[in-house]
Amino acid sequence: MLGKRAKAEKCDAIDGILEESESLLEDFGGTAAGDAAIIFSCQAVEHYEITRYGSMSAFADALGMDEAKAHLETILDQESAADSKLSELAEDTINDAAAEYDEDESEHA
């Protein structure tokens, strides 16, 4: 579309989210709290992506790059849908189970 090859670059922000996720799973892996940690870690990645794709779409719009903007908007919609599904999963099942885990742990402490 732009006549240039995409290049991979290391993203310190995503690396930080993944490191935090690993730490949480070391503490809570295999529990409902661990499941909640996985979901909110995935949501942190989704939110980062939503911010980036939203910004790129705005730049494409400002530059009059309609085809690029349309493509970026499609990706942005997919990222937003994934975030919504993760929220729904957390709210419908995982958060309550994680709260019960927390209460059980508090009683035994």
Where are the language model's segments positioned?
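Amphipathic alpha-helical coiled-coil segments
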Residues: 1, 82-90
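Solvent-exposed, charged/polar functional surfaces in cytosolic regulatory/catalytic domains
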Residues: 1, 20-24, 78
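Conserved alpha-helical segments that form or flank metal/cofactor-binding pockets of metalloenzymes
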Residues: 1-17
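Metal- and O2-centered redox machinery and metal/ROS homeostasis
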Residues: 7, 73-76, 82-83, 108-109
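Acidic/histidine-rich alpha-helical segments that form the ligand environment
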Residues: 12-73
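Short, structured secondary-structure boundary patches
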Residues: 31, 89-93
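Acidic, carboxylate-rich catalytic segments that either coordinate divalent cations
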Residues: 95-109
